[in-house]
Design a protein with these regions (language model features):
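Carbohydrate-binding surface patches
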Residues: 611-653, 696-699
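Catalytic cores of secreted or luminal carbohydrate-active enzymes
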Residues: 561-608
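An acidic-aromatic substrate-binding cleft motif
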Residues: 259-352, 360, 364
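C-terminal beta-strand-rich structural cap/linker in extracellular carbohydrate-active enzymes
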Residues: 677-704
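N-terminal accessory beta-strand-rich subdomains and adjacent acidic, glycine-rich linkers
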Residues: 22-295
Length: 704
């Protein structure tokens, strides 16, 4: 690893006439200008290639209990400049090594009236800006409560935005594409039902927010290293096109309880004239602390199947019985009730999944609905809902563990909390120890429904601290965590790579809840995945959900070839083949791609991209010279031209191409696909047609 600092300058200012500082990126393409206004209000501007992309925007924080907030009346008392350049190795990721190169400007500001000091630290990379607030230890600012963070992001015009409604509890919305000026009138139609939701403004949107200016500049706003702070949303003034940060409140309406010394999360702006650069940016990861886990040998990417989709579609149930309307854990005797015959997490059925996983080379099997409590788990705001260790009578924990071990298959635990965070924390050590005792080294946790204690939100400070506690506690037991319904990620997986996955967006399950837009996965890599990988659970081959459950008329709004492409487009070290084994058995030739595609990558190339319309990505296997290409296409059929110049010169490869058939269409003919093979080199160019809602996948094997 390279790791060096240069040009370290500290200057004390009397600051008369010296209230503006500038910072350039290492390659000189970006320039940030900081200034204090006449009343001492901090501001910043951002330029790319001499073009303003963020207009002068105010910085500051409003305090809840103090007469004077940290908004103005500042003077500059210290300036420190650094340059930092390193290349760090990933435990897992889209590449094995990431370059972290930035110029830094740390400005100490002192408030005249209160003599309080804050530091605003800027880091300017070759692809964008990160900045945060820092609160040094001082007698005039120790314990304080945030009423609101007043960070602004002033846009230069009425950009096109790809947004979801600002919500304290969920990100599980379809994206809306509109001008900024149109958000207000479209907001109510963009809000769809969810198990728990709370909007705050009809111009409020969530990050990661993706935009495109009229002159073709792509801009992404997000945050990094969200720890012990509230999740940031953005509230738009649609008269001025200025976004202001909007933090998630707690049950009392406060936005954060802080104790100096402390820091805010980083606010990030990624920008480029090429959409592919947004996908390639590693600013979010680079702004997080290095890995804190000394031995990471137990953290391993996983390809898995699971007893899950059949419950999501309504074909099977999580609950063991229909005879118990009210479960009292430790009192209700499930051995004395009649099973409902739809309970999927039974020993015989789970062993069938284990057999399928072993036959086709998967690593693990997830089982949901194995533990007592599912009869009244949802909508009751029940605290003691699960104990995470007591199985239903038809689920033999030891027998399943022994059987899976004999087949070389790992089991993935499921901990649904029903939002009862205190109950989960009370049982966490016992639950994690139960996992270790029974051979589970990964857990999928869930937070469906309103958060308990009541009044808190999924994205408020104390609940974010709960998620972090579960991640760090899991390290003690060498357990990998895949958190669903938790806050969207902000790069913390660099620091704690046992956080191997999150959902935290509208995943595949919504295809069985009425469907998602056909261009959904052309937007997720530009938005949700900017913060970290997503357990999207692709691989659905049967698009007509009524064939699984006659009472569910949902339709999966993609083609089968698109589902294959998602294993490359939707990066995750945790990849599920989500459909039922019997559906894969009908399409074993297409299923071969899912079997072949790795979950560990050496490098990634972004071949073509336009948010909302198409994405094509090539990735090289970490453990071989093989490459894999995936495409996801939006509503309009198109032709992709694939340049194979990413392949090594002088070598020959065989490409197996899984593409939409000529008559494929996500609505009318989603299972129409074709498979072909051809020899390719780094000089090859290939044109592939994609259907509406379609895509393609290519496996490229070196010919030796």
């Amino acid at each position: 690893m390279k790791n060096y600092f240069v040009s370290v300058i500290a200057v004390l200012f009397s600051i008369f006439g010296m209230n503006a500082q500038d910072l350039q990126s290492p390659n000189g393409n970006f320039k940030m200008i900081f200034a204090l206004e006449n009343d001492g209000t901090p501001t910043y501007q951002l330029f790319m290639n001499n073009k303003e992309i963020i207009k002068k925007s105010k910085l500051g924080l409003e305090l809840q209990k103090d007469k004077k907030s940290l908004l103005n009346d500042f003077k500059l008392v210290n300036e420190v400049r650094n340059t930092f350049d390193e290349t760090w190795k990933t435990v897992w990721g889209e590449e094995t090594a990431i370059k972290n190169h930035y110029n830094e400007l740390a400005l100490t500001l002192k408030q005249n009236e209160t003599e309080r000091q804050i530091i605003i630290r800027f880091r300017l990379f070759n692809d964008g800006l990160g900045f945060r607030y820092e609160f040094p230890e001082q007698k005039n600012l120790t314990y304080f409560v945030l009423k609101e963070e007043r960070t602004e992001f002033a846009m230069t015009g009425d950009h096109t935005a790809f947004w979801i409604p600002g919500d304290y509890d969920t990100q599980e919305y379809d994206f809306t594409e509109s001008k900024l000026s149109e958000i207000r009138k479209l907001f109510s139609s963009a809000v769809t039902g969810n198990a728990s939701q709370k909007q705050f403004s009809d111009t409020g949107v969530q990050t990661s927010l993706m935009m495109k200016s009229a002159d073709g500049i792509y801009i992404n706003i997000h945050e990094a290293a969200l720890i012990n702070y509230s999740c940031m949303h953005l509230n738009l003034d649609d008269a001025t096109f200025i976004f202001q940060s909007h933090l998630t409140p707690d049950a009392k309406g406060n936005k954060g309880h802080l104790q100096a010394p402390c820091v805010s999360p980083w606010r990030t702006i990624i920008a480029s004239s090429d959409a592919r650069d947004i996908l390639a940016s590693r600013i979010t990861l680079n702004l997080n602390e290095p890995c804190k886990i000394e031995d990471t040998s137990w953290i391993k990417p996983v390809k898995y199947i699971g007893v899950w989709w059949e419950m999501i579609t309504g074909k099977s149930s999580w609950a063991y019985t229909d005879e118990v309307p009210s479960v009292q854990l430790g009192v209700t005797d499930f051995t004395k009730v009649k099973p409902n015959k739809t309970h999927a997490a039974n020993t015989k059925h789970v062993k069938e999944y284990i057999d399928f996983a072993a036959k086709h080379g998967f690593d693990a099997v997830l089982v949901e609905g194995w533990n007592e409590g599912w009869e009244d788990w949802f909508g009751k705001e029940k605290d003691y809902v699960f104990d995470f260790v007591t199985p239903y009578p038809d689920f033999d924990v030891k027998g399943i563990h022994d059987y899976a071990k004999s087949k070389g298959i790992k089991m993935i635990m499921h901990h649904e909390t029903s939002g009862a965070t205190r109950n989960y924390e009370r049982h966490l050590d016992k639950a994690y120890q139960f996992m270790k005792d029974n051979g589970y080294d990964a857990v999928k946790s869930g937070y469906v429904g309103n958060i308990l204690p009541l009044g808190e939100y999924h994205y408020s400070q104390s609940i974010l601290n709960h998620y972090q506690y579960c991640i760090e506690k899991a390290v003690d037991y060498k357990i990998m965590v895949n958190a669903h319904e938790a806050v969207r990620p902000t790069g913390i997986c660099r620091t704690f790579p046992n956080l191997i996955g999150n959902e935290s967006a509208r995943g595949t399950e919504f295809q069985a809840f009425g469907g998602s837009k056909a261009n959904h996965t052309t937007l997720l890599p530009f938005t949700r995945l900017i913060g970290g990988p997503m357990d999207y659970t692709p691989g659905i081959f049967e698009m007509d959900i009524a064939k699984l459950n006659p009472n569910n008329n949902s339709h999966v709004n993609t083609t089968l070839a698109n589902q294959l492409g998602l294993y490359v487009v939707m990066y995750s070290p945790l990849q599920m083949a989500a459909d039922l084994p019997e559906h894969y058995n009908r399409f074993l030739d297409a299923f071969q791609f899912i079997k072949d595609v790795p979950v560990e990558w050496a490098t990634s190339k972004y071949l073509e991209a336009e948010p909302g319309y198409y994405i094509t990505i090539a990735r090289k296997d970490k453990n071989s010279n093989n490459w894999f290409v995936g495409n996801s296409n939006g509503y309009k059929a198109r032709t992709s031209t694939i340049n194979f110049n990413f392949l090594e010169k002088g070598k020959k490869y065989e490409a197996t191409i899984y593409a939409d058939a000529e008559n494929a269409d996500y609505k009318t003919n989603p299972q129409a696909y074709k498979i072909s093979k051809q020899k390719v080199t780094n000089n090859t160019k290939l044109q592939l047609k994609t259907a509406a809602g379609g895509g393609f996948a290519i496996s490229i094997v070196e010919i030796k």
